[in-house]
Structures are given as structure tokens and as C-alpha cells.
């Protein structure tokens, strides 16, 4: 039995525990309570123990894309990344995805929901010990492309850790036909899609106008993105919809009626000038919602602390109410809320007996949040990757400050970025990528 203790333990599903402790063995939590009862074990002063953070929308394969197309409107930005992606192959995607997985663990993230072009994100997550769902992206008109995803899933499953589950990601309504959406859903695996992210998407589906027309083969339906999928029976509880910025009350009701989960990505939406999702209305409708960082292609980092702060600012600014989203509510969106969005709430997202021992220790030493008043607010507004001391997945150390540097991994990813910057476009390899031995 191993015990960790800290000034505060935040179970999320229960009341904060001052001078709390978490006991665990064999990958699961045995007990959560006062350190006076469980023992101190390894003690973290001026710190908080929280559930491992859950990032509900990532693209690990874009971990080195920072700055590409910055300042461009959504349509041209999309074109920039389509062109850049064609410059590298399978091994480079894997090198980049490994960096993305390492950055998640180093920032306290233990679980991800990733949309992966090559499948490299699944291998990287498995190698480095992340938990998650990695959905293989599909694009285009032909329903047969779902068979490509099926084959990729079959090729990858034997090399993956059991913590990583594979899914399928029909990219978006403007890049995937309804026939391919349906074929992808029929695979019977989790579904990740981008939905109602921008006004460009709305314009294109409505009447074929706007910059997306330069890259899309999909015939406009005359409907908004949510109504487009709903009209074809393509909404359901297996769907995790990233963004949902451009939605009205009727569309929110449709999402709720079909129990669609939403990944809320306020920094990405702000960086691309798309606006902010109506978080208050989405929450009021009872939707399952988790926070996601998206990728460094559209946001600076995989930092969920920054995402929590952005969610608070966006909610309060949009609603013009200082209580539109409290610190503890933002923390819930990055833990238990995101776990619900992934249908993993029985296993992760909160600290309790029988749950997976996915834990993050955050130090607030030297911060203006000490002495303590509200430990949840302190984590949300004072936390950062630099303050993460320890990240455990199934009770196994996957990051400890000062102990995991990943120098070789960083060099390989930097070399891949250099090729993204300078190599002439080629057809990217999407052959299965093998894990390191």
C-alpha cells in the first residue's frame, strides 16, 4: 500500500479534505481521507492532490505546430495545416506525438481524447503511459474510407497498452460525407468529431460560400452543422463533439436530446477568432462537457491549467457575470466532467475507493494563494505545468518533477518540426507506426 498526503486533497466528487491523504495499491485507490487516519506516507508540503487531469480534445501529432498560420482566419489556417502535414511521414508523426504525450504527463494530464491522423498518438500514449481514447481520423466522400480506419485499428491494437482505446474520428461535417460518417459510426467504437467550430463552417454547409470551399468536396446541405448531422441520424451518446461554438438554443437541445458529449476548447476558439462556446447554455441543458486544449496548431500548449483559466474568463466575459463559472467548476470540467464526456467516470475523474489511481500533485509553494483560502481556486488560478510535482497513472509514476527530462524525445520532435518548416510537400505515410522496443 502506498500513501501520498498533502495540505489538501480535492476528490472533486466530494468535499475537500484538509491535510488529506490518498492510499492506493494494485493500480486502484484504496481510501481517501485525513492523513491522521491513513498516514502521511510521502508528504507534499504546500501542495494539493487532485484527480489526474483529463484532456477532452487533443492532437498529439501537432505538438510542434506552434505558430504555424498564426493570425490567419479559420479557412486559410486550415489550408496551411493541410499543406504542412503533407511534408512528413510516419516516424516523424510518432516523434511529435511522443513529445505531445510527454507534455501532457508533465502538465498533470493522465487521460486524453485524441484525434489522430496517422495513429501515432495511440502508440505514443501507450509508450509513455497515458490513458485515453485515440480516434483515427477519416476524411472524404467514400464510405469505404471507414474500412481504412478499421484496418488501422486492427493493426494498432496488438501493440497498445490496455489503457489506450481506439476510436474513429470523422473530421468534420465540411470534410466528411454523411455516408462516411455513417460507415464510421457502424464500426462500433468511440467517435470524435469537430462540430460547429467556426462561422466559415456554418457558411460552407449553408450555401457553399467562404474559404472552406477551396478545400472541401462535400456538397453543402443548406443546414447548420448540428442540424446537418441530426437530419441524417448522426448524433448519439458515442459522439464526442469538439468545439460547438456556433450553436443556438435549438441545436443545444438537439445535442442534449441525443446525449452528445462536448469538448470545450476556449483557448483554441479564441486564438482562431471563432468566438466562445455558450458554456452556460450547454451546462444548463445537462450536456456532458469536458475541457480540451486542442493542439499547439491552434493554441499555445497542452496546458489544462491555462485552459481552466480561459474557460473561467470566457464564461464570465460572455455572460457578464462574475459567478458564471467558479474555479471549482472549471476543475470539475478538467476532471470528472471530462471523464463523463469519455464515458470513463466510473474509473477516473475523481478520487474515491475503487477508482483508478490516476493522481496529480500540484505545488502552490511561493504563490500568492498561500496561506490557503480556497484550494480549488488556488489550483485553477495558480497552477501550471511548472508546479506539477507528480503524475500517476494506475498508481505508476509517469512524471516526477526533476526526474523525467525526455531529452532525446525533444530532440527528435525538434528535428521533425524543422522538416515541417523546410521540406517540400510529399504524400504523407500513414503506414502503422511501431512502438520503440
Predicted segments, located by residue:
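Active-site microenvironment of metallo-dependent hydrolases
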Residues: 1-20, 25-26, 35, 332-437
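Histidine/acidic residue-rich metal-binding segments in metalloenzymes
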Residues: 38, 123, 149-261, 273-289, ...
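Active-site gating loops and adjacent loop-to-helix segments of metal-dependent hydrolytic enzymes
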Residues: 64-95, 102-105, 128-129, 133-142, ...
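His/Asp/Glu-enriched, well-ordered alpha-helical/loop segment
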Residues: 231-235, 277-366, 382-385, 392
Amino acid at each position: 500500500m502506498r500513501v501520498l498526503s498533502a495540505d489538501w486533497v480535492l476528490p472533486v466528487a466530494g468535499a475537500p479534505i484538509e491535510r488529506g491523504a490518498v492510499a492506493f495499491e494494485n493500480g486502484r485507490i484504496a481510501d481517501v481521507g485525513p492523513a491522521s487516519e491513513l498516514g502521511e506516507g510521502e508528504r507534499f508540503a504546500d501542495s494539493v492532490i487532485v484527480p489526474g487531469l483529463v484532456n477532452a480534445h487533443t492532437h498529439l501529432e501537432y505538438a510542434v505546430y506552434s505558430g504555424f498560420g498564426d493570425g490567419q482566419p479559420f479557412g486559410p489556417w486550415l489550408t496551411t495545416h493541410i499543406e504542412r502535414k503533407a511534408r512528413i511521414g510516419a516516424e516523424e508523426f510518432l516523434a511529435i506525438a511522443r513529445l505531445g504525450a510527454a507534455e501532457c504527463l508533465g502538465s498533470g494530464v493522465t487521460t486524453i481524447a485524441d484525434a489522430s491522423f496517422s495513429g501515432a498518438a495511440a502508440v505514443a500514449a501507450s509508450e509513455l503511459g497515458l490513458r485515453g481514447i485515440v480516434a483515427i481520423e477519416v476524411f472524404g466522400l467514400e464510405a469505404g474510407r471507414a474500412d481504412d480506419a478499421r484496418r488501422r485499428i486492427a493493426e494498432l491494437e496488438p501493440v497498445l497498452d490496455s489503457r489506450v482505446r481506439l476510436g474513429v474520428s470523422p473530421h468534420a461535417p465540411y470534410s466528411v460525407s454523411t455516408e462516411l460518417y455513417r460507415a464510421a459510426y457502424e464500426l462500433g467504437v468511440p467517435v470524435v468529431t469537430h462540430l460547429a467550430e467556426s462561422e466559415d463552417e456554418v457558411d460552407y454547409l449553408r450555401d457553399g460560400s467562404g474559404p472552406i470551399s477551396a478545400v472541401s468536396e462535400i456538397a453543402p446541405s443548406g443546414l447548420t452543422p448540428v442540424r446537418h448531422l441530426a437530419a441524417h441520424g448522426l448524433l448519439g451518446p458515442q459522439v464526442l463533439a469538439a468545439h460547438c461554438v456556433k450553436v443556438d438554443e435549438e441545436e443545444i437541445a438537439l445535442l442534449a436530446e441525443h446525449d452528445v458529449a462536448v469538448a470545450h476548447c476556449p483557448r483554441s476558439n479564441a486564438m482562431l477568432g471563432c468566438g466562445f462556446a455558450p458554456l452556460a447554455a450547454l451546462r444548463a441543458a445537462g450536456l456532458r462537457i469536458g475541457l480540451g486544449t486542442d493542439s499547439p496548431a491552434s493554441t499555445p500548449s497542452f496546458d489544462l491549467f491555462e485552459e481552466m483559466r480561459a474557460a473561467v474568463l470566457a464564461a464570465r466575459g460572455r455572460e457578464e457575470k462574475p459567478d458564471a463559472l467558479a474555479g471549482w467548476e472549471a476543475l470539475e470540467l478538467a476532471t470528472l466532467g471530462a471523464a463523463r464526456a469519455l464515458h470513463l467516470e466510473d474509473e477516473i475523474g475523481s478520487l474515491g475507493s475503487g477508482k483508478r489511481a490516476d493522481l496529480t500533485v500540484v505545488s502552490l509553494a511561493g504563490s500568492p494563494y498561500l496561506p490557503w483560502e480556497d484550494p480549488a481556486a488556488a489550483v485553477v488560478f495558480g497552477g501550471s505545468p511548472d508546479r506539477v510535482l507528480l503524475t500517476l497513472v494506475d498508481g505508476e509514476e509517469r512524471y516526477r518533477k526533476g526526474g523525467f527530462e525526455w531529452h532525446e524525445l525533444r530532440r527528435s520532435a525538434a528535428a521533425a518540426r524543422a522538416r515541417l518548416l523546410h521540406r517540400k510537400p510529399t504524400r504523407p505515410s500513414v503506414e502503422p507506426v511501431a512502438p520503440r522496443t
